[in-house]
């Protein structure tokens, strides 16, 4: 009986250790899965690395292109030409509730004005509003090449843009027409100055390409008579003999 009880106690110990190990493994797996779950939920990237098992060159190309995505910013056109909401502006009722449409039209007018504020690469075409404001501030600067543009015109555009995009005041039909008129005037002035500058550069390049006619150079050769040649040779020999005598006398002293 004593040996049987010892055997049963040994079996119980083994079973307890086995069940304890199993419970520990299950708890470890559960905790690990929960940690991975929360880590993936808080992670913004994909659950699997991009380009997994791909060649190194392809993986680098994928990473380079994905890194450019965060720099892509685009301002779409707010109102299309055939937008049904534009018909609401033609109604004779109370148009004050449709002033937001004039705000949208004011921002779209920057795109349709064709002002080349993105031509120098400093103001990309994708960010219309932000770079248009920077362009206006550059025009108002004294060091700008468009100093002839009136500052009052630029101030009108800046105020109209700020009111249409960020302002809380009234921006209705009158404000929009005033803003549109100033925008058209600026576009005309800038295009005229750019056209005159291009014509000036073309004329300067044309002047450089047209080189003046080069007159043929003439070489004049003078031949000495034979008597003068003999005299020059005789004088040279006399001078050489005098130099030799002088060197001999100097060495003897």
UniProtKB/Swiss-Prot annotation:
Cellular location(s): Membrane; Golgi apparatus; Mitochondrion
Principal location class: membrane
InterPro entries registered for this protein in UniProt: C1orf43 (IPR010876)
Keyword Translocase set for record: no
Entries under Pfam families matching the protein: NICE-3
Top-level taxon in the UniProt lineage: Eukaryota
Claim: Membrane is one of the keywords in the record: yes
Annotated TM spans: 11-31
Membrane topology according to the record: Single-pass membrane protein
One Gene Ontology cellular component annotation held by this UniProt entry: membrane
GO biological process assignments: in utero embryonic development; phagocytosis
UniProt keyword terms in alphabetical order: Golgi apparatus, Membrane, Mitochondrion, Transmembrane, Transmembrane helix
Comment field on protein domains: N-terminal region is required for phagocytosis of Gram negative bacterium.
Function: General regulator of phagocytosis. Required to uptake Gram negative bacterium by macrophages.
Protein name (Swiss-Prot/TrEMBL): Protein C1orf43
Taxonomic lineage from the root: Eukaryota, Metazoa, Chordata, Craniata, Vertebrata
């Amino acid at each position: 009986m004593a040996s049987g009880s010892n055997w049963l106690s040994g079996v119980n110990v083994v079973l307890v250790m086995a069940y304890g190990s199993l419970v520990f493994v299950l708890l470890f797996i559960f905790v690990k899965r929960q940690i991975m779950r929360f880590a993936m939920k808080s992670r913004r990237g994909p659950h699997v690395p991009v380009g997994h098992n791909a060649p190194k060159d392809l993986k680098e190309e994928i990473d380079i292109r994905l890194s450019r995505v965060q720099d892509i910013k685009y301002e779409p056109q707010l109102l299309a030409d055939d937008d049904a909401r534009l018909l609401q502006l033609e109604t004779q009722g109370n148009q004050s509730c449709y002033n937001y449409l004039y705000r949208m039209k004011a921002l779209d007018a920057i795109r349709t004005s064709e002002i080349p504020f993105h031509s120098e690469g400093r103001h990309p075409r994708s960010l219309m509003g932000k770079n248009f404001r920077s362009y206006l501030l550059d025009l108002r600067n004294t060091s700008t090449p468009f100093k002839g543009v009136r500052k009052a015109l630029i101030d009108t555009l800046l105020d109209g843009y700020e009111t249409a995009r960020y302002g809380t005041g009234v921006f209705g039909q009158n404000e929009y027409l005033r803003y549109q008129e100033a925008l058209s005037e600026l576009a005309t002035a800038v295009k005229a100055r750019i056209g005159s500058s291009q014509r000036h550069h073309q004329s300067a390049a044309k002047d450089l390409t047209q080189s003046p006619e080069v007159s043929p150079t003439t070489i004049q050769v003078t031949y000495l008579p034979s008597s003068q040649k003999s005299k020059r040779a005789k004088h040279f020999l006399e001078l050489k003999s005098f130099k030799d005598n002088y060197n001999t006398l100097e060495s003897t002293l």
